[in-house]
A protein has these predicted regions:
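Polysaccharide-binding surfaces and accessory modules of carbohydrate-active proteins
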Residues: 2-253
Length: 255
């Protein structure tokens, strides 16, 4: 059963942390709308997605399509959360650990004068053995849309910006179903849309931006990342909830 760990509100945005066993997930919703959160019929989305080279590839027929939800993620354990509040911002730091000595830090910052939040992910090897990461998310959001239950067909729109060097972004809007982002009848096979830019061009095919719109409830989750290297964003779905993550390109996409 999913329990509410903490809630924080600032700048018109509410962050809801929910815990299910060792998994802590983050929901970002408009302030005042948290009472409408209904989604609990999908897997809780971990705060951090990561993949170590020594760990097996993820299951669910997803090899070569995604590196999300690997055994690396399943080894993470929640150890605590702190919050520093001031008039202009709230900084929430969540700690996760791995039995191999890896310490993960997820930092969320809410701003009083900005409706957007900032998410930063860090990992430190506190053990004696070397490890190689081949995927680490900067952010990830799951259980989309948290205001729906079940499949909620034809209610999620995906917005992306196609572009290239010295060009304007061209908006492309597609239904989640048109991108095959819907679960199988058994909710086992994982479907993924992974896109981004390989190389130091920040815009090369796509702008580092993606938005998921819940047309049934009038809420949109939009994310952007800024990197001077290969980057990616990824839409993922294996059950009733959709997930959106992004950051550095993983080994498969950025190689």
């Amino acid at each position: 059963m999913r329990e509410i760990l903490n809630r924080y509100t600032l700048g018109g945005l509410t962050a809801v942390y929910r815990r299910e066993g060792d998994v802590v997930e983050l929901l970002l919703v408009p302030a005042g709308s948290e009472g409408g959160i209904a989604r609990a019929d999908c897997a809780a989305e971990p705060l951090i997605q990561a993949k170590l080279t020594e760990d097996d590839a993820p299951a669910s027929f997803s090899g070569g399509r995604t590196m999300r939800n690997s055994p690396t993620v399943k080894a993470m354990r929640y150890t605590g959360q702190t919050a520093q509040k001031s008039a202009d911002k709230t900084v929430v730091v969540t700690k996760l650990t791995d039995p191999r000595g890896l310490a993960y830090t997820h930092t969320l910052t809410l701003y009083a004068d900005n409706p957007a939040a900032e998410v930063v992910t860090r990992v430190e090897n506190t053990g004696s053995e070397a490890h190689t990461l081949e995927m680490l998310s900067s952010f990830t959001l799951g259980s989309l849309s948290p205001f729906s239950e079940g499949l909620a067909p034809e209610t999620l729109k995906i917005h992306r910006l196609r572009s290239t060097w010295s060009a304007e972004g061209r908006l492309v809007t597609e239904a989640a179903e048109d991108l095959q982002l819907e679960p199988s009848w058994k909710c086992y096979s994982a479907n993924s849309v992974r896109f981004g830019s390989v190389g130091s061009f920040p815009v090369r095919g796509f702008v580092p931006f993606c938005a998921v719109e819940d047309t049934a409830h009038g809420v949109t989750w939009a994310a952007a990342t800024t990197l001077g290297s290969s980057w990616q964003m990824e839409l993922y779905r294996s059950d009733m909830g959709l997930s959106l993550s992004g950051g550095l390109a993983d080994r498969e996409f950025g190689a």
